Amino acid sequence: MTDSSTLAELSPDFQRIVEARHHDPFAVLGRHRRDNRDLIRAFLPQAEEVRVGSAGRVMERIAGTAIFECEVEAETTDLHYRLYWTDQTGQTHSFIDPYTFPPRLSDFDLYLFGEGRHWNIYRVLGAHPHSVDGIDGILFATWAPNAERISVVGEFNGWDGRRHPMRVRGASGVWELFIPELQPGLLYKFEIRNRAHGTIHLKSDPYGRQFELRPNTASIITRESGYAWNDADWLAQRKDWPWLHRPLSVYEMHAGSWKRDLEGGYLNYRDLAHELVDYVKSAGFSHIELMPVTEHPLDASWGYQTTGYFAPTSRFGTPDDFRYFVDHCHRNGIGVILDWVPAHFPKDAHGLARFDGTALYEHEDPRLGEHRDWGTLIYNYGRNEVKNFLLGSALFWLEEFHLDGLRVDAVASMLYLDYSRQPGDWIPNKYGGNENLEAIAFLRDLNTVVHQQFPGVLVIAEESTAWPQVTRPTWTGGLGFSMKWNMGWMHDILVYMGKDPVHRHYHHDQLTFGLLYAFTENFVLPFSHDEVVHGKGSMLAKMPGDEWRRFANLRVLYTMMFTYPGKKLLFMGCEFAQTGEWNHTTALDWPLLESNLHKGVLHLVSDLNRLYQSTSALYAYDFESQGFEWIDSHDAAQSVISYVRRDDDSHVVVVLNFTPVPRHNYRIGVPEPVGYREVFNSDAECYGGANLGNWEIKTESVEWMGRAQSVVLTLPPLAGIVLAPVAPSATPDCGTPGDE
């Protein structure tokens, strides 16, 4: 260690090197021209002796410091020379001096990043294999404008922040260093010294592609992937996929608790791919939505407290293992949507919080920068580099992993400055309102760029308020999302279904109110993970009554969901009526499928999926009023509703009975004077029902409900039926029930 008197004798540059606080170590270290000779200088705190070349000149120690220097002949010394140094144990080490290499990042890269519009920023910042003058190594770069000094530390330098200080690139706030001969697989972090206070922070790489398995937090140098994709046909078709008018049935799942291995551990992405895809295909879903697999430190956060925005979590394997997962889904006709969290981030010391000793990614004022309910921090969307970080993350997952969509979490918390805040605990925008103008601009940029760069990819908002035009184009004043979750419908229908059927006629409006706004947005109907946790009970547990009634209620609820306007989303376990709440620490309760009732619900969901996807009237106009018309929305006394779903050329009739009372001789008006037949009945025996229903139904010229013709039906209790005009049509595998 250099004493204070010696330090005082050094030049300011030398002092800053010795104290590990120099912003431009290249000004001191490396190769410098002196007259007709070159001066080589290095800083090696553990060295006893240093040579240039294995048999070259011994470098002189400067004033008792760990700075070594010597003069060499320029013509006889390699441009990128190798230094050999001996430590206190007598062991010799060697390395090519990193301070002989010029800056690698282009001014244009830095300009675009400063403007917040570098769509490939993940290829610039972070740690990347790189070659300079035929020498392979790793180029490190990070953004920390308020740092006095940043060093790359890792197992390659004993985690010593004095060994590899980086250079700052002007006013950009970006720091970089090329370290020769490093290999992928090594652990690293950034050691950051704050300019104002001199505090030192050890941080994971915000752009890291892979991380240690928690609880460890180091980033891992990764090589550029050589994964050979096999989904070219899928991607080509996706570009022209008319998703507005196509069926979308999403299976939401948590990769860590869908299934476990024999020892109770996590499945690898590759093993999960095979088991999950086979199951999802058999159940008839079109897409899988993964709860966040971005790297995160806390299992109990379910992935929603992200620290690695460019890395699949190491819990389930490597980045290439995740590529295999997506590839296998695509080769089997299954799309993949990722739950992505740009609304907030955790306070973990190794993460983004106060990254350079200041509120860099977040706001300094907690009234803007903190979610106190969640214990997390809020991004500063008005800062170009922060916006670019998030946009780069979204584009990274779509480009590198071929994902088919992003579900954007907690959008409402981004839109409102007063979200979950008391009066006086938030700061109005410049117009005095509660709208977060910077977040709105970010979301519009996100949707615009994603749709431009990746046609056919979906961006879906979890947005729980009445914010207008969430799914309308940005050029008309909308936010530009493809779809949004219909939280209002979900809430109303679950409240209704929780009522004892004897009381439901008092709450009939909760069945029908949703149609007043059903076509104001492009809605997804979600029964998500949020509805089966925190004491809310499982979907089955929400249903009233004894065992028969609970299962029948759930079957009619799912029938309504799959025939109601909007795309579909169902959380794992709900498809077979799991009895308990979801628990992220264990697998789903798969033994329940040994029960005929639970197996029947899975059969019902599978048949509803196939009916939905094979019946264009049920999906072609999910987002337009021409695809829906009421037959009768007013039969509150009997808790029955009926409606028509249409496309341009066909229609189906849906009748739902929400009481445990069979309705015989129940007449409804129908659109056309043709025969009808049941193509679906949730009371079918194979679903666990009593097999009460209708065979071919004759239309009568009896005016009813304002229609010229009508039919007389038998409505099974707590059940829904779907009728189609007599023609070849989809029929459940177990057959259509008949009158008894």
Curated annotation (Swiss-Prot):
InterPro entries: A-amylase/branching_C, Branching_enzy, GlgB, GlgB_N, GlgB_N_E_set_prok, Glyco_hydro_13_cat_dom, Glyco_hydro_13_N, Glyco_hydro_b. HAMAP family: GlgB. It catalyses: Transfers a segment of a (1->4)-alpha-D-glucan chain to a primary hydroxy group in a similar glucan chain. Its EC number is 2.4.1.18. It is an enzyme of class 2 (transferase). Monomer. It comes from Methylococcus capsulatus (strain ATCC 33009 / NCIMB 11132 / Bath). This is 1,4-alpha-glucan branching enzyme GlgB. One of its GO terms (cellular component) is cytosol. Catalyzes the formation of the alpha-1,6-glucosidic linkages in glycogen by scission of a 1,4-alpha-linked oligosaccharide from growing alpha-1,4-glucan chains and the subsequent attachment of the oligosaccharide to the alpha-1,6 position. The gene is glgB. The keyword Transferase applies. Pathway: Glycan biosynthesis; glycogen biosynthesis. One of its GO terms (molecular function) is cation binding. Belongs to the glycosyl hydrolase 13 family. GlgB subfamily. It holds the Pfam family GlgB_N. Keywords: Carbohydrate metabolism, Glycogen biosynthesis, Glycogen metabolism, Glycosyltransferase, Transferase. The active site is at 409 (nucleophile), 462 (proton donor). GO terms for biological process: glycogen biosynthetic process. PANTHER family: 1,4-ALPHA-GLUCAN-BRANCHING ENZYME.
